[in-house]
């Protein structure tokens, strides 16, 4: 993660986080999204609700 000023920092890339980060970037904001997993989507999409069905 490079240092410097950002307009928006989104913590977590669940269903709300990644949409917020994408929309902010589309609106011209310098945006960074912090996620502990290697893929976006959060726990439900990657290891919880959807994969368990």
From Swiss-Prot:
Locations listed in the record: Mitochondrion
Gene Ontology terms: cellular component: mitochondrion; oxoglutarate dehydrogenase complex
Bound cofactor: record note: Binds 1 FAD per subunit.
Chain coiled-coil ranges: none
Reactions accelerated catalytically: N(6)-[(R)-dihydrolipoyl]-L-lysyl-[protein] + NAD(+) = N(6)-[(R)-lipoyl]-L-lysyl-[protein] + NADH + H(+)
PROSITE patterns the record matches: PYRIDINE_REDOX_1
Activity control note: Lipoamide reduction and the NADH -> NAD reaction are both completely inhibited by copper and cadmium ions.
Keywords: Disulfide bond, FAD, Flavoprotein, Mitochondrion, NAD, Oxidoreductase, Redox-active center
Disulphide bond pairs: 44-49
Predominant location category: mitochondrion
pH profile of the protein: Optimum pH is 7.5 for NADH -> NAD transhydrogenation, 6.5 for lipoamide reduction, 4.5 for NADPH -> NAD transhydrogenation, and 6.5 for NADH-ferricyanide reduction.
Cofactor needs: FAD
UniProt xrefs under Pfam families: Pyr_redox_2
Broad class of enzyme this protein falls into: oxidoreductase
EC number: 1.8.1.4
GO molecular function, one term: dihydrolipoyl dehydrogenase (NADH) activity
InterPro entries: Class-I_Pyr_Nuc-Dis_Oxidored, FAD/NAD-bd_sf, FAD/NAD-binding_dom, Pyr_OxRdtase_I_AS
Residue numbers binding FAD: 35-44, 53
Origin: domain of life: Eukaryota
Keyword Transmembrane helix: no
Note: The active site is a redox-active disulfide bond.
Subunit structure as annotated in this protein's UniProt entry: Homodimer.
Family, per entry: Belongs to the class-I pyridine nucleotide-disulfide oxidoreductase family.
Function noted in UniProt: Lipoamide dehydrogenase is a component of the glycine cleavage system as well as of the alpha-ketoacid dehydrogenase complexes. This enzyme has lipoamide dehydrogenase activity and NADH -> NAD transhydrogenation activity. Also displays some NADH-ferricyanide reductase and NADPH -> NAD transydrogenation activities.
Protein name: Dihydrolipoyl dehydrogenase
Originating species: Hymenolepis diminuta (Rat tapeworm)
Lineage: Eukaryota, Metazoa, Spiralia, Lophotrochozoa, Platyhelminthes
């Amino acid at each position: 993660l490079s240092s410097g000023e950002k307009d928006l920092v989104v913590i977590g890339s669940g269903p709300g986080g990644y949409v917020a980060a994408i929309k902010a970037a589309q609106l011209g904001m310098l945006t960074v999204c912090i996620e502990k997993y290697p893929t976006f989507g959060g726990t439900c999409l990657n290891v919880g609700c959807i994969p368990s069905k």
